[in-house]
Amino acid sequence: MNAPVGGIWLWLPLLLTWLSPEVSSSWWYMKATGGSSRVMCDNVPGLVSRQRQLCHRHPDVMRAIGLGVAEWTAECQHQFRQHRWNCNTLDRDHSLFGRVLLRSSRESAFVYAISSAGVVFAVTRACSQGELKSCSCDPKKKGTAKDSKGTFDWGGCSDNIDYGIKFARAFVDAKERKGKDARALMNVHNNRAGRKAVKRFLKQECKCHGVSGSCTLRTCWLAMADFRKTGDYLWRRYNGAIQVVMNQDGTGFTVANKRFKKPTKNDLVYFENSPDYCIRDRDAGSLGTAGRVCNLTSRGMDSCEVMCCGRGYDTSRVTRMTKCECKFHWCCAVRCQDCLEALDVHTCKAPKSADWAAPT
């Protein structure tokens, strides 16, 4: 039966346009682009004009961002190491992750958040290390202040996280056509959640001065925590991500399931359910789990039952060198021997009749 004019079939092309990004954030490809700043700025595909302007104007910041890509991708892979999709990257793809992030899924939400957080972390750290011309330590942390332990003096080098957040917002969000399509709004929201996550773990560190370290005087500064804390926090947000739909005027979100609360600025949001990532699917960007190592004794996501999607697994015996027969020698060393250890490794079987990828 034909739908009436103004019905769902009329809205479907517009909905698909809203949900389909042109490409993923191609600035991620800066990790693989070396050479001078001009070479880097002109050869990263897909940068919008504002991003290229910032790239040419702040080549030292771009180098910091490029180095930071390796750090946040490693963190992404750590968090997803026991899952079917393991945040694998494609070296020859300028989107870095391939087609998997074209879907507005939980995984896309996490990657946008962790990448935005990675820019904040990398830029802020470079500021504190004196590597950037446009910033240094936080200039606002001067003079005397108070906390629950009393009065202290600001000293040392407080991480200038406000600069890191400001630059990350200007550079990363520049690609998103804010207010024009659903995916751009989703990306902007998750980018902001990532930036806020880094600041959440900014901590005050102090050094005591006085007789025998009596803390008669204290000098304090603000420092970012290890990036793993941000990764762990965003992982929890990934597991609690909220599915949303566009509101009627196309300017914001509403929850897809009315039983759930409205997302806060700290929550990750997504539109589409994830594929199961069990088999290789070029359209979905999934490499499948054939050849992936699984844990025979686990009951979690890395178990052979879950990881292999019920297809079964192959077992092979391998040997590895380990330290053994360790003894303590006075004083003060532990000396060990090198021993060969045999262990069983379990890997997921391939689908019986499917084109499957090499181990991921």
Curated annotation (Swiss-Prot):
Bridged cysteine pairs (disulfide): C76-C87, C127-C135, C137-C157, C206-C220, C208-C215, C278-C309, C294-C304, C308-C348, C324-C339, C326-C336, C331-C332
GO biological process terms on file: atrial cardiac muscle tissue morphogenesis; canonical Wnt signaling pathway; cardiac epithelial to mesenchymal transition; cardiac muscle cell proliferation; cell fate commitment; cell proliferation in midbrain; cell-cell signaling; cellular response to transforming growth factor beta stimulus
PTM annotation: Palmitoleoylation is required for efficient binding to frizzled receptors. Depalmitoleoylation leads to Wnt signaling pathway inhibition.
Molecular function terms from GO: cytokine activity; frizzled binding
Gene3D superfamilies per UniProt: 3.30.2460.20
InterPro entries on file: Wnt (IPR005817), Wnt2 (IPR009140), Wnt_C (IPR043158), Wnt_CS (IPR018161)
This protein's record includes keyword Phosphoprotein: no
Lipidation (O-palmitoleoyl serine): S212
GO CC terms: cytoplasm; extracellular space
Glycan attachment sites: N295
Keywords: Developmental protein, Disulfide bond, Extracellular matrix, Glycoprotein, Lipoprotein, Secreted, Signal, Wnt signaling pathway
Keyword Secreted assigned: yes
Principal subcellular localization: secreted
Annotated compartments: Secreted, Extracellular space, Extracellular matrix
Signal peptide range: 1-25
UniProt function note: Ligand for members of the frizzled family of seven transmembrane receptors. Probable developmental protein. May be a signaling molecule which affects the development of discrete regions of tissues. Is likely to signal over only few cell diameters.
Annotated family: Belongs to the Wnt family.
Name this polypeptide is given: Protein Wnt-2
Source organism per UniProt: Rhinolophus ferrumequinum
